[in-house]
């Protein structure tokens, strides 16, 4: 029953995120960088109807906003922004819970598009045991011509139970890790990027 309830929550969150059919990416200069992609992503409303943000997006948005202003992060938050690598990592640790947001982007093989990825994961007392309410691994394809990004099927079958995903800071492959109930690593595999999708 608990698994079913969590699945329903995840579906609801997925549907809400799917409402962001197309996101305009605003930037200065000749091309957007990772901060431009991330900021456009977190400032796009969860719902076209109510225009509100969920709790997780609000936390990430606040962290990015403070970074953009050159201000200190809230207590328990750390942020890593590597513009050269096209990678951002935000970590929040509160009361034994750790929220991790990873974002990255790179050029697709045809050079007409870029892939933007965002991964949100929750762990408790250092253990990755099941999905948090806002967990998700989402992909968007950015169109260099229209300067917008839309939801993209990158070929990844996402599973959130005892599974974690590590987005690349270098390279273009995703590391998938399965964890046992006691929080120990059981196995790892690599999702290989082929220029347009991931292969298992």
Segments (PLM) and residue ranges:
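Mid-length scaffold segments of soluble, non-membrane domains
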Residues: 109-153
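Short, surface-exposed coil-to-beta transition loops
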Residues: 97-101, 116, 126-128, 132-137, ...
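Bacterial Sec-dependent N-terminal signal peptides
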Residues: 1-22
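Short aromatic loop motif centered on NTY/YTY
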Residues: 148-200
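Short, solvent-exposed loop/turn segments at conserved positions within beta-propeller repeat blades
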Residues: 30-33, 81-84, 130-134, 182-186
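Short beta-strand segments that buttress and anchor functional surface loops
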Residues: 89-92, 117-123, 175-181
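Terminal domain-start segments
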Residues: 20-106
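Structural signature of eukaryotic scaffold interfaces centered on beta-propeller domains
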Residues: 102-111, 164-170
């Amino acid at each position: 029953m608990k698994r079913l309830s969590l699945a329903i929550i995840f579906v609801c969150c997925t549907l809400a995120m799917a409402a962001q059919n197309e996101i305009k990416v605003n930037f200065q200069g000749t091309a957007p960088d990772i901060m431009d992609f991330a900021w456009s992503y977190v400032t796009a409303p969860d719902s076209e109807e109510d225009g509100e943000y969920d709790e997780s997006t609000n936390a990430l948005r606040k962290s990015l906003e403070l970074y953009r202003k050159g201000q200190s992060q809230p207590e328990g938050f750390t942020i890593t922004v590597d513009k050269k690598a096209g990678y951002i990592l935000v970590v929040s640790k509160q009361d034994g819970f750790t929220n991790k947001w990873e974002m990255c982007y790179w050029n697709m093989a045809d050079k007409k598009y870029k892939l933007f990825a965002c991964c949100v994961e929750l762990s408790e007392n250092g253990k990755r045991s099941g999905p948090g309410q806002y967990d998700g691994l989402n992909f968007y394809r950015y169109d260099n011509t229209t300067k917008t990004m839309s939801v993209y099927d990158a070929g990844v079958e996402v599973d959130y139970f005892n599974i974690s995903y590590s987005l690349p800071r270098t390279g273009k492959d995703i590391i998938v890790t399965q964890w046992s109930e006691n929080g120990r690593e059981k196995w790892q595999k690599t999702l290989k990027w082929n220029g347009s999708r991931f292969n298992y």
